[in-house]
A protein has these predicted regions:
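Short, amphipathic alpha-helical interaction segments positioned at domain boundaries
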Residues: 91-131
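Catalytic cores of enzyme domains
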Residues: 129-284, 316
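Short acidic, hydrophobic short linear motifs in intrinsically disordered regions
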Residues: 52-63
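Long, low-complexity, charged/polar intrinsically disordered regions in eukaryotic proteins
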Residues: 1-31
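Flanking helices and flexible, charged tails adjoining ferredoxin-like Fe-S electron-transfer domains
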Residues: 318-427
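Short amphipathic alpha-helical interaction segments
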Residues: 63-79
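A short, conserved structural fragment
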Residues: 78-89, 307-308, 345-346
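Ferredoxin-like iron-sulfur electron-transfer modules
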Residues: 96, 242-250, 254, 272-301, ...
Length: 427
């Protein structure tokens, strides 16, 4: 790791961010990113905030300032989407988003004049793509990942016997969301500043629910209705973009429409494909090899290089090729089905279904256990002041398989919680 020269406030926040389930390994580049986005004083204040939603009164108590001053600071941070804000039971709350998916992306989801976005893009590229510690922590360390692939619904015939659950459909996420926003694609916008972007649509990044509502109110997303949302999805399909969204069944907060060249999830899937950095869909392409003409269109559009042309073993035409699938790398997105002129590729169910966490709490608990950081989630900065938050986390732990419960108990090292897990699990 490079020599760290960050000042105290940025170092405090870097350590704080690294306690999120997905982590944010300290780095010279991380400190530089933070220094572009905020002052050292702001970094020190943010570092003291809990993971769970909190009120201005709570922040004032933590910072030891008046509530009026706390509100002024919090609103300024929310205006720059370093914090998100929302109303819970009639009372305004704030929450510190993780770096990704979170304030890293938010910083590039519109054109801004208050920060140097070109410099920021270069720093993101170095920290995320070149150094690799962050991307490995985000996409590789553990079985449960941040995001998952949604199958292209147009590749599943309506008269097919295949069953697609509602939580596997982007269309259902759009149709059922209370709020939906669309913003600039963080990945392609970043690459644009580096002179490496492709010509895929830029304004097509989707957010939902309370995240979308906060981004919309602060000018980082444009509110769209269900009809326009479905039109944007159709546009993404037309451009052979992959739908990569939050790895939860309920209350999905984001869906990115990813190209293979710019988008970090797809880059990670190519680099670390055998480690399953992105959860796949529950479908897999199947090729009728006798009908394959070897045109290579599926190879061209596959974002993770899971498709290739191999010898057709045709003695009459020894140079003849056919498409082949690397099942260990395939995300099950379906873009290959859409472009096949011979219509010899179809989507079929995977032999083993992929388990999707129920909600964000379930996902966070699973990620924390697998990455050895559950104690950070539970004994976070004053997080236990909320019995509701504690109950949600313990409830998710108690629903885990026995092996995961044992791992959780070992990590927490709390007599009370350990005994509770043992009692409920019969261990």
């Amino acid at each position: 790791m490079a020599h760290l020269t960050a000042r105290k406030g940025f170092a405090e926040l870097a350590n704080r961010l690294n306690r999120f389930p997905q982590g944010a390994p300290p780095s010279e580049y991380l400190y530089k990113i933070l220094s572009v986005l905020m002052s050292e004083e702001e970094a020190s204040l943010i570092a003291q905030l809990p993971i769970k939603p909190f009120t201005s009164k709570k922040a004032a108590g933590i910072w030891k300032v008046s509530e009026v001053k706390a509100v002024r600071i919090l609103e300024n941070l929310a205006d720059r989407v370093l914090l998100l804000d929302m109303t819970i039971k009639g009372e305004k709350h704030y929450v510190l988003p993780p770096p990704m998916a979170g304030f890293f992306e938010f910083s590039m989801m519109r054109t801004r004049g208050d920060i140097d976005q070109k410099l920021l893009s270069e720093l993101f590229y170095q920290y995320i793509t070149v150094e690799e510690d962050f991307i490995k922590a985000l996409f590789v360390n553990g079985e449960t990942q941040l995001g998952r692939t949604f199958v292209n619904e147009d590749t599943i015939p309506r008269d097919s016997d295949l069953f697609v659950y509602d939580y596997e459909k982007v269309s259902k996420v759009i149709e059922t969301a209370e709020h939906m926003g669309v913003s600039m694609c963080y990945c392609r916008h970043k690459m644009q500043h580096l002179g490496k972007n492709c010509d895929a649509p830029m304004d097509i990044c989707m957010t939902f629910g309370t995240v979308a509502d906060s981004l919309i109110r602060h000018g980082f997303a444009r509110r769209v209705g269900k009809e326009e949302g479905l039109e944007l999805l159709a546009e993404a399909y037309e451009n052979n973009l992959v739908q990569f969204g939050e790895n939860v069944q309920h209350e999905v907060s984001f869906i990115c429409n990813c190209c293979g060249c710019c988008c970090e999830a797809m880059i990670a899937a190519r680099k670390f494909g055998l480690m399953n950095p992105v959860h796949t869909s529950n479908f897999m392409p199947e090729i009728v090899h006798n009908d394959c003409t070897g045109c290579g269109k599926c190879v061209e559009v596959c974002p993770v290089e899971a498709m290739s042309l191999v010898s057709a073993n045709n003695p009459v035409k020894p140079r003849y090729k056919k498409a082949d699938i690397d099942e260990d790398r395939c995300l099950g997105c379906g873009v290959c089905v859409r472009v096949c002129p011979a219509q010899c590729i179809s989507m079929e169910p995977r032999k083993k279904r992929v388990i999707t966490p129920v909600n964000s709490v379930h996902k966070a608990v699973m990620m924390s256990i697998e990455r050895g950081g559950l104690e950070h989630l539970i004994f976070d900065n004053r997080a236990l002041s909320s019995h509701r938050a504690m109950a949600a986390i313990i409830g998710s732990v108690l629903k885990l398989p026995p092996v995961k419960k044992v791992l959780a108990a070992e990590q927490i090292k709390s007599r009370y919680l350990g005994r509770l897990i043992e009692k409920k699990s019969g261990l």
